[in-house]
Amino acid sequence: MDSLANAFDSSSALLNHEIAYVLGQMQDDNAVPHLIERLEDLNEDVMVRHEAAEALGAIGNRIAMGTLEKFASDEEVVVAESCEVAIDLLNWVSSKRLEYSD
């Protein structure tokens, strides 16, 4: 996971988008701070920020909720909409985890 997160230093928006996607699919809580950093970086490509939001939703760690709520009103519509979807997904994923732990 750390090797992927370190690759976020790439200047390629396409590579960074794919890294965010893979981190979301891995559903590793250790990726959350790296994805939050990508989402919060207003200089980051919109495509990367969008995928970081979706990945945070897929991971389902409630630590990301505040950031997702903050950027649900982002001026970039695709980022705002991705955050809204991610909030719903995060709620669903985290509720499923609770069901399985009971």
What are these regions (language model features)?
Residues 41-42, 53-57:
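Short, glycine/charged-rich beta-strand-loop motifs at protein surfaces that mediate ligand recognition
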Residues 63-89:
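Preference for long, well-ordered alpha-helical segments
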Residues 1-9, 28-40, 61-73, 94-102:
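Amphipathic alpha-helical scaffolding segments comprising HEAT/armadillo-like alpha-solenoid repeats
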Residues 11-29:
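Helix-adjacent hinge/juxtasegments
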Residues 11-12, 43-45, 75-76:
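Short inter-helical turns and helix N-cap capping residues of alpha-solenoid HEAT/ARM repeat scaffolds
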Residues 22-25, 55-58, 86-89, 93:
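Core register positions within helices of long alpha-helical scaffolds
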